[in-house]
């Protein structure tokens, strides 16, 4: 199970997230472990690849809630950015933002092993 020190080193704002998790380290760590396995990351990728910006917005918005509540800052920053761009249906290449999101998710997933 990932430790608070590992999460801090990765960039999570543990001090912000812990009160939301009743200051229970094991509970927070379990939630982080579940978050990195969230299928919504892949659904976001699939929706963007299909050009379905409405679905992509739904998935990005859902991820924003998860990553924000757990204060997973390195993922949350690009998730928030892509959510707002999708909300306004900005015509652009979402690939770089998606790559950053998935890269940070994968890095955190490795730490959770």
Which residues are covered by each model-predicted region?
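Two-component system phosphorelay core
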Residues: 1-113
